From Swiss-Prot:
Signal peptide: none annotated. This is Methylcytosine dioxygenase tet3-B. It catalyses: a 5-methyl-2'-deoxycytidine in DNA + 2-oxoglutarate + O2 = a 5-hydroxymethyl-2'-deoxycytidine in DNA + succinate + CO2; a 5-hydroxymethyl-2'-deoxycytidine in DNA + 2-oxoglutarate + O2 = a 5-formyl-2'-deoxycytidine in DNA + succinate + CO2 + H2O; a 5-formyl-2'-deoxycytidine in DNA + 2-oxoglutarate + O2 = a 5-carboxyl-2'-deoxycytidine in DNA + succinate + CO2 + H(+). It comes from Xenopus laevis (African clawed frog). One of its GO terms (cellular component) is nucleus. Its EC number is 1.14.11.80. Fe cation binds at residues 1223, 1225, 1794. The gene is tet3-b. Residues 1827-1860 form a coiled coil.
Amino acid sequence: METQPASVPCVLPQDVYEFSEDRESLGRLRVSEMPSELNGGGDGSKGDGAAVVATEVSQQSNKKRKRCGVCVPCLRKEPCGTCYNCVNRSTSHQICKMRKCEQLKKKRVVPMKGVEAVDKDDAKNQAKEQVPSVKNCSESILVDGPKTDQMEAGPVNHVQEGRLKQECDSTLPSKGSEDLANQLLMEANSWLSNTAAPQDPCNKLNWDKPIIPNHIAANNNSNLEDAKNLVAFSAVAEAMSNYGMPASGTPSSISMQLYEKFNYETNQDNSGHSEGNAPSCPEDLNTLKEALALAKHGVKPPNCNCDGPECPDYLEWLENKIKSTGKGSQESPFPSLGQVSKKLVQKSYHKEQVLNLENTNVTCPSGNLPFSQNALSLAKEKNISLQTAIAIEALTQLSSALPQTNNEYPNAPSQPLINHNDQLTHFPTAKGNQLPMLPLSCNELFQNQQAQLYTGKNALPVPQSPRQASWEQNKKPGYQESEYIPENLSQSSSVLPSDASTPQKKEFLQQWVQNADLLKSPSDPMTGLKQLLGNTDEYIKSAFKGPEGLSKKIKNVKSKHTIKSIKKESADFTKMSPDQQLSQLLQGNDFHRNTQAALQQHLHHKRNLFVDSNTMEACTQEQQNWWVPNSQQAPVSKTTEKPVKERKKRRQSPSQKQVEPKPKPPRKQVQIKKPRVKEGNAVFMPVSQISLDSFRRVEKEENQVKELDLENSLPINVQPDLLGSQSIQLTGSQANLENQKTVNTQETCNENQTSIGKANNFALCVNKTNSLVAKGRCPTPSTGDSSSGQGDSANQHTNLTDVPGQNDLSCIDDKFEDLIKQFAAEFGEDFSLPGSEVPSQNGERPPKQQTSGVPQFKMPFPSQLPSENATHSNPALSNNLLTHNASHKFDSLFSSKSPKQIKIESSGAITVVSTTCSYSEENQHLDGTPTKSELPFNPTLSGFLESPLKYLTSPTKSLIDTPAKMAQAEFPTCDCVEQINEKDEGPYYTHLGSGPTVASIRELMEERFGEKGEAIRIEKVIYTGKEGKSSRGCPIAKWVIRRQSEDEKLMCLVRQRAGHHCENAVIIILIMAWEGIPRALGDSLYDDISGTITKYGNPTSRRCGLNDDRTCACQGKDPNTCGASFSFGCSWSMYFNGCKYARSKTPRKFRLIGDNPKEEEFLKDSFQDLATKVAPVYKMLAPQAYQNQANNEDVAIDCRLGLEEGRPFSGVTACMDFCAHAHKDQHNLYNGCTVVCTLTKEDNRMIGKIAEDEQLHVLPLYKVSTTDEFGSEERQLEKIRKGGIQVLSSFPREVRKLSEPAKSCRQRQLDAKKATAEKKKLQKEKLVSPDKTKQEPSDTKTCQQNPGVPQQQTKPCVKVEPSNHYNTFKYNGNGVVESYSVLGSCRPSDPYSMNSVYSYHSFYAQPNLPSVNGFHSKFALPPFGFYSFPNNPVVPNQFMNYGTGDARNSGWMNNSFEKKPELQSLADGMNQSYGSELPEQNYRRSSEVPHHYSLQNSNSQKSVGVPHRTTPAPMETTPYSNVPCYNKVIKKEPVCDPLVDPFQRSNSVHSQSPGVNHSLQTNDLSYKANGALPSSGRTNKEGPCSMFLPSDKNGLEKRDYFGVHSNVPGLKEKQWTPYGIDVPVGQRDSLDSQCSGKVWSSCKLSDSPAVMPSTVQDKNWTGRQASLNQGVKEPMPFQEKLWNSVAASGRCSTTPNDRSSVTPCAELQDKNWMSFPNPAVNSLKTDSSQNHWDPYSLDDNMDDGQSKSVKEEEDEEEIWSDSEHNFLDGNIGGVAVAPGHGSILIECARRELHATTPLKKPNRCHPTRISLVFYQHKNLNQPNHGLALWEAKMKQLAERARVKEEEAAKLGIKQEVKSLGKKRKWGGAATTETPPVEKKDFIPTRQAATSLTDSTTTAFSYAYTKVTGPYSRFI
């Protein structure tokens, strides 16, 4: 490794300067460093050296050194982007290491040299430097403000200044020195390890600074002090940044020293070190080993130019040193008093006190210092003085503990640590002066703090995470040994210190949470690392874990070594021996350091993140603290003495807030309250249900326990002191600051120790604080008791606060109860816990403890864990705490369960505590009280990461683990391409198989399949991304891959990923097992499935069944035979948001239409057996995909198919001649596949024989490779010649087209709903209309019946049974087919009703589809339009019950004509009905115009303009009998009226109907608006138009909507034969009589004409018209005009059908109508007598007519599609596979676009291909079909409803308002509709008048108004 010419020391100043954030801070840093160095060099002449250095530094800082501009780094223009500075550019203001001028680096050597000399001469200078560095570190740790500002703001500056002055460094501003030291340390860290550099909280590479070497070299006090400061700072910094590096500063400094020595030895020229540097370098084995470990983990000297994370030369040198070195000097300068004082000052200790402490420490010889093993080992390993090591360890421990105390995250943690360190440091420095402080080493202090933190009683509530445990264990050796227990505490009980430590641990945890870096600072690198790495997002959790582990380990160690030493050492101040702690730290740190070394870089990176996280954590803690009433906040206020630090401390330490509980906590509570309210709207428990009593009880119990613990743990005298001292501490500013800090730490500890630790620690702190305050010192006792002392003081304060708080718990409870009540509804869980916890903790403390015990948040039972910790720490206290806390834990969890108990949510590997549950009832205890630091309450990223579900507001989310979704496979890391672009190379997935080459794929498949050679065929396909499809957007194939021979068993399609040569360069996209199932099984399945499903199956409408325009009829048009898909097994329900059987007690996975249990069982057996047999094949061929799908089998076995273990499928879809357009199965399981079992027709089961009609499976985005798997083009051509690959050419093909776009399921559903609503309204109106009908003229008796459908029903003239129609159509069982509009309806029960989702019978099957579409459309076409549309015999109007399902008549055919309508009325009805049919047909044409409204009277047109098929379509699937027109009794108004006005009205009303439109316009005069039958045409509410309209009212409404047409055909005022023939009245009568003789349905009439070919129509029309006329008894004289007009109107009305079958319509209109007039009537008479056809009886000529009309319509619909463009572009894909009978195809349908080609003649009754698609839905992974989810959802909905109700009640809003609103809507709609009706009535104006005059009419208009209400838009 090439070292930079400048030795690290030299580089350091420069680096610091270069990297310093600003000159000022740099100057300060330099001043502090240099003075310390100079001081060190000055051999104790601190002042002189300091002055000189200060001068130099100030000069340097004042005059920024300029780059030489000639060295390589200067010439380098671009930053490397990889070094720490570059990576952390935003935070590190230093230049890229690669661009750092060599001269600047060298330049720094001068100060270093001086410093080194000084170091050798005077260690105090280093100590001083260390102090500033420590301050800097803390400052860097501090989140509140700039390090400089913080340092300046901190009283430590004064102390430092005083100390510096004492050290003769008066010229240096303490802050500047601190900054300098910090920067130096930072640089040293970075220097020692580039990664370590980040360790420096300041984010500056201070390791480069020679100060560290100075520490090493210097043994004098100044050097020791500087070293201590630097080490402490580095330790804190590294602890903060790398946590894993306990004394990262120390190791860094050691490393720097070592590296300097290394440079000195290897590159003396380049090393700027003085000769003393090398000798000064500590070379003890521990130090060397530690440096080696660091170096191995990427901690390189700053000058190292080696590439990579390690410096081989340096490593080798270290190894050699280790070999040659026996033991390094254990002496290491203790952290300088300056450091300690700085820290103390930073902690807000009085300057005088700090100085006193320093003096005392100075007086204390290092020998007197109780050194922890960690400190000793640290000193040895790092080659630093024992004092330095102690300082480092103390700082490390303190830093870990300090985070709790930090008001400013960095400062508070570091300050408490520093305080301990200061104490310790001073102790060592004093070496004899401060025995009390000395008893605990820094490590001990740190450990004690942490131990207390972790092991204190408060720790009990805080569960220890394994990480924490391990961390604590690692740290414990030192901590336990060094655990300091103030004399009071030790006297009271060893447990108390443990408690204190535990609370501190808790605090530490809090601080950890708040300050990940600080938390990491504890000596245990593992814990820090774990916390940093593992708990970045889970500071609380990590805190819990770390503290727990620590508390346990610390408890053990402390109980052994620490407690003893602590008791001995804790006499006065902290009595923690830094050496002991250091030794412990070193012992545990060897391991930790290794870990740290490994994680150091990562931690450093994390540190930057964590700094923010710490800030967030602090905020979180504050938020947590909100739980604590003002008492906690009051301490915060005290902390506020030091605005920034204290504030941070406040944030950090809930206990501190508790200690200073006055106003802020409530504020925070409010804030938190608000956020929580925001976070959780629906809490598990309503406020009313929240029981605070349990919490209070728990709190009381906890308080009692705490009090008992305090009493037990604390000496009796101490307890009073606790209370008194608490106030004292609060009183003393230093005490306050320290207490605040302590409190912060304490809070952390307290959270752990909450019950006991708080009181104990608090008492200790109070006593010590009191003594300290009295002494004028910062309450070092608590601080000195790093873990116990400081934590104790904090805990004491907390405990005191808690004790009062406990006493105040009732008050707090009241407050919290209020809060809880306020938040309970939304956060009830959290609030419940807070309430209980707060009471137990003092109310304030508990929340904070929870805050500090953030671990509680993570730990299900933080209280329990903390109890354990406390127990470990203090056997007595721990026992008490454990017992009490455990009881509380359990009580909290069980007895004091908050209404919202903690819910442990787990999703995959993530387990989250319930969001608003305040974590757990145990948390309700001290620790249980959620604190802000518990993130769940804070909307922070870390909080979210901590508990994602907590941010879910719904109880369902918190209660339930949402279905685990397997993440999409990540792209493999390969260097083949810069970026994987699936658009270019195709979708990436490997679960079917992958390999580097095609040959590897063959090997793979041969291994899987077990055969080789020809048995396996591999075809290469190329992804083009261009979809091959016909001009109409339907699937096409360009290449067909076929099975070549029987020898071929397996075929795989593989794709070469463009540009890839990696292990996944070739992936399998499709596997075809030609013989997937036995032939016999396939044959039987084909027969069984085709027979059963065809008869009883319920087709499923699929979007992929249509092209983009939704106009293709690829499935076929015949609803009985069109291709369709049928779903079985479990499938996803949008309603349940889970399996559709979520609420099914007895799921019918293989449900068929109707009640066919035998068939269902048979089908079930077939599919289950098949699934059982297919699964092994799937497993064999695609094991990974199979496994992915079978993973959750045991969990969701209810949603799986198969009879044996290994069920990869949740559902199966049977596609029968179903053409699936290109699509992806987006909802399939991630990394799963669809397995398609193909069954083909008998003529397509031979290999090598291409059937006349076949269906192919297409991959539209792929093209076939020009070479075979071996790269041979010849072989590929040979395959083509042999038929293995069929190359298709462009050719035009006849395709089916829908006249109108098919409606989507959503549209159909909406229409159905609207129709239903209208039907209901119509039914209501019908009830009223009969009376009105009665009111109508007697001559219109029969017609009058129209208005009164009930009358009609009661007096049926003609009864029609729609059921027959259905039966005729064979829709009884297969209503599905009809309903299967464009692939079937979802509701086979009523496939024919508008209500049915698929009320529109398969458009493919509907010859008159256009009409159907039109009718289906929202247009208010007359029902006839819809159902006359069924003119196609295939789909009678009844099936199209758009209007037929008229609720009013509920099947006029059944009852509508119960009262025989006059023949005229019937004729009118008939005319309208069939007229409408004809018109429907015409309507197709006219509809093309205005939707079958076009030609009618202008008014009628206007009215027609409103396509009102709403009613008709919406009508139930009611048979035609139910069709309004059918159901309706054709009602007539008085003949005179009907002839004219009524006709006009009807005409106007019906004018909308297309058929009528034309006729009306042309023949308007003849029958005016509607074919003016007095009542039947116009008046019948249920008249012919009503046929079209569900009810007469609807008819009117719809007539209005439909226009004349609906009513006109049969409703002309004049009685006209339904035939529209001018038949004399007598004839009409005869016709009527004839018609009446036979039950007939106008629908049928309409059906037949529309459906039948012209000839058929002619025939039917004549016969039927006659029959109609016959049926129509009152033959009002039919005007030929009317008839003609009717014919015309028929045309018009037919127009709608005309769209679908224009020709038939035209013929009917022309021929039929022409022929119909009189001859038709005659023929009608004859035919009617013979062929009185029932529109429902599909038999009468209907079949013929249907077939003919269907054929004609199909012919008309068929168009030619050309795919030539696909073949012109060779890159357009279209690779198809011709699946054979019994073959199994496996593909990733989720990722690959796939399709199936349409069949020429689809016939699902005898399907060409049955595709059984087995799949697994991605989310069907819940047991019992996801019933729990559903129930949770229902609960959630109920809760929401409850909340809404409560809100409504609060607002005084009545829930009825909504219904009123709806009514208003309806009313408004009705009102709106009414005007539209009037508009429709433009021609219907008369109708409107009639409405006014005629009750019937009025009813209609009203009904119209109501019905149209929301549907006014249809008008």
